[in-house]
Amino acid sequence: MPIRVPLAWLAAAVAVALSPALLLAKGQIEVVAKFQRPNLELDVATYTDPEFESPGNKVGVLGFASGPVRNSFSLRGEDWAQLTDLWAKATRMQSRKQWRTVGTLSERGTAEVSRLTVSAGQGVRLAITSPKGASMAFLVGSAEMARFEAALAQVKDILAK
């Protein structure tokens, strides 16, 4: 069951990513899954803006947080499949010996473009770089891979509605 939380920081970041007109919008964040490390959290979520018509009113979001430092990466439904494809490729490319970059995605429709780099090694690393916030990387370990993949699929389904 999704966790619904009022994450003002994530809503603001997503609103900026979507359009300046959304800055004042009252949207809803639905956190599909949370992944935690001692000093870092990664949320897989959706953001829905009720002021826009469906299906263009939703984006998928990866929200990174380390204490008070936060950043997010968002993709519209038509772009979310690229993330799931990169994820699948990264899970196949894992190696105990070295890290390899699998691919990079960029946000669209914003002046402050965040980039997400997916790498494979001993797990899958998701790294965000952005002019609007701190660069962060989250390592999804083997024990969490199935749950992360399921969260990506759930967001894909939500965005398709």
Report residues per predicted region.
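Hydrophobic alpha-helical transmembrane segments of integral membrane proteins
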Residues: 2, 16-17
